[in-house]
A protein has these predicted regions:
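Active-site-proximal beta-alpha core segment in soluble small-molecule metabolic enzymes
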Residues: 1-87
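Active-site anion/phosphate-binding pocket segments in diverse small-molecule metabolic enzymes
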Residues: 68-176
Length: 176
């Protein structure tokens, strides 16, 4: 990535993923040294900028977003900031299913980025399965949360060993 960025004269922003128990992607949350060393590596790569740290909840492994796992994620980032003397701009705490904490006014202070797709397109809060206000269909019951909205083709860029059982309070998976 660095070589190609330099070749193209570009700066690629990278969101380093930390797996907080959902088994989706990223470095396993208990592997602090590996997380820190990867941040150091990114900081030293020409043409690459650490955009922030990211995680996912309630996707592959059905681990619910909670105040605790959000704060644990932030603690990893703050420890890295202190240890390396850097500022991490973004703490991206999940996908559409993390919105439930915002909806319930429980979003941990310091989480400042959220990656949403279906929530934006359909207005569905996927944990409690209800439409958000201000959508034209917000008074209707949510009957189904599956759609052919996106098709994704990608190559595998990460292979790692992780536990086979998710860690945290479980909910429904993202493959309704």
């Amino acid at each position: 990535l660095s070589d190609e960025a330099v070749k193209q004269g570009k700066k690629h922003q990278v969101l380093l993923m930390i797996d907080m128990g959902d088994l989706r992607e990223g470095i396993w949350f208990t592997e602090y040294d590996q997380i820190r060393d990867t941040v150091k590596l990114i900081e030293d790569l020409p043409g690459v900028e650490l955009y922030g740290l990211g995680t996912n909840f309630n996707c592959y492994g059905t681990v619910m977003p909670t105040v605790k796992n959000g704060e644990d994620f932030l603690a990893i980032g703050h420890k890295i900031e202190k240890e390396l003397g850097i500022h991490i701009k973004r703490f991206s705490a999940g996908n559409c299913t993390s919105y439930v904490l915002i909806d319930r006014h429980q979003w941990p202070k310091g989480l400042n980025h959220l990656r949403i797709g279906g929530l934006h397109e359909y207005g569905i809060e996927y944990v409690a399965m209800h439409y958000l206000d201000q959508y034209h269909h917000s008074t209707k019951d949510v009957m189904k949360a599956c759609s052919p909205l996106y098709k994704l083709k990608a190559e595998i860029i990460e292979l790692d060993k992780k536990p086979t059982v998710p860690v945290g309070e479980l909910g429904v998976d993202a493959f309704l």
